[in-house]
């Protein structure tokens, strides 16, 4: 069945059916294959795309820019200090201005309501590159990566655990995506870091139709047993005070992904995933500062260096797939 997603916004996975999500994943796989084999056809020739970044980025910005260039589009980058958005001009007005100049707009920033306003008033496709509540482009990359490493399983047959801060945009988005695609997800976190009950209830309602299983637990062994994938993210999100680390570490240490936890899955083929950047040693300024202040973190914070560098880690396949899935979103909503 062909899907027409042309002119649709991509703001959160709650807005899409399982079949539409699967269509975008299949398109991403096709575009990846075409790029690798040298027969990619540009379907965004003559299109102009604006990238609004109110938060810093490596993977998301690079993926959008390279995807656009591969497909023949032109890009304007508007960084945190490069525009009047929110300072002298409202997002509603910005949307109506940029929508007359550009064919598509990406937004990465703060509240979900901001990108929803942009999407409501731009009149062109708007893509969510990350908000405080959701990170939907990352989830498509994650699910494409899972498909590639699931040893023949369909997504609906996959079991995975997300460990750590399950109330953040990654916990929210993985739960929504898993519910939509009929997956078995375990959100393994201290109770204070569980997702909002309203969103959990919404996802469980979706799960009744798709066959998904959603478990929210503090019990690490219950959460990881039998998993195909273990997933984590940083314990302190962008924009949070550095002082937040102290209160998090004692709560979060039992949820650090290490080799013992991989073994606890009982699956010798288990894979490790992380949306990156990851604190897994002292090779960054933040990592070094944390290790000096908290010696127990010298081998890593949310994940140990041993895990990231092990055969179980697929984090760089996952990072590359940001490019192919973001390209699929742009082609599906804007392509000719």
Curated annotation (Swiss-Prot):
Q: Into which EC class is this enzyme placed?
A: transferase
The terms describing its cellular component in GO are: cytoplasm
Would you identify the family this protein belongs to, as annotated?
A: Belongs to the aspartate/ornithine carbamoyltransferase superfamily. OTCase family.
Under NCBIfam families, the record lists: orni_carb_tr, PRK01713.1, PRK04284.1
For the ligand (L-ornithine), the binding residues are: 169, 233, 237-238
Keyword Ribonucleoprotein applies: no
Q: In which pathway does it act?
A: Amino-acid degradation; L-arginine degradation via ADI pathway; carbamoyl phosphate from L-arginine: step 2/2
The record's section on SUPFAM superfamilies has: Aspartate/ornithine carbamoyltransferase
Gene Ontology biological process terms from the UniProt entry = arginine biosynthetic process via ornithine; arginine catabolic process to ornithine; citrulline biosynthetic process; L-arginine biosynthetic process
Q: Which PROSITE patterns does this entry report, sorted A to Z?
A: CARBAMOYLTRANSFERASE
> InterPro entries, per this entry?
Asp/Orn_carbamoyltranf_P-bd, Asp/Orn_carbamoylTrfase, Asp/Orn_carbamoylTrfase_sf, Asp_carbamoyltransf_Asp/Orn-bd, Orn/put_carbamltrans, OTCase_ArgI
Q: For this UniProt record, give its keywords in alphabetical order, as a comma-separated list.
A: Arginine metabolism, Cytoplasm, Transferase
Q: Which GO terms describe its molecular function?
A: amino acid binding; ornithine carbamoyltransferase activity
Sorted alphabetically, which HAMAP family does this protein's record hold? OTCase
Q: What does this protein do?
A: Reversibly catalyzes the transfer of the carbamoyl group from carbamoyl phosphate (CP) to the N(epsilon) atom of ornithine (ORN) to produce L-citrulline.
| EC number(s) from the headed UniProt entry | 2.1.3.3
Q: Which reaction does it catalyse?
A: carbamoyl phosphate + L-ornithine = L-citrulline + phosphate + H(+)
- Compartment(s) where it occurs, according to its Swiss-Prot or TrEMBL record: Cytoplasm
Descriptive protein name: Ornithine carbamoyltransferase, catabolic
Q: Which Gene3D superfamilies match?
A: Aspartate/ornithine carbamoyltransferase (3.40.50.1370)
Q: Report residues binding carbamoyl phosphate.
A: 57-60, 84, 108, 135-138, 275-276, 322
